[in-house]
């Protein structure tokens, strides 16, 4: 029927799902958890090392503190599910399935962080990032991470000024 094809740049699946997991933990919206459900239900995806690596990078550059995203208390999705999700997808997914996905993500993702991931995140918030712990040579140049480090430096200075 159509004789035209196009090529468009897209995110690598590790970047896509790494960022989706940050969004799912942060916003706790059914749309994000639907995508995480897809990741878990696709045999070649799941919490693959490259996906968790990308998650750590997106988490490192997120505007909220790392611990607030990674260990956020779960919120009810019932209202957003009814008002903003039902009818959005071709495949019907019930709220219970999305809540089970949320539970699984909260349980499994912290356990999937390697010692290198944990050490990198700690070094970042300590304002002494050890870039060698992550597989991306360009990480120190990402604007979101540079912004995060600038804000952490300002916070450290404010704290020191109040203290003494």
Question: What are the functions of these language-model segments?
Answer:
Residues 1-164:
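Structured mid-to-C-terminal alpha-helical surface segments
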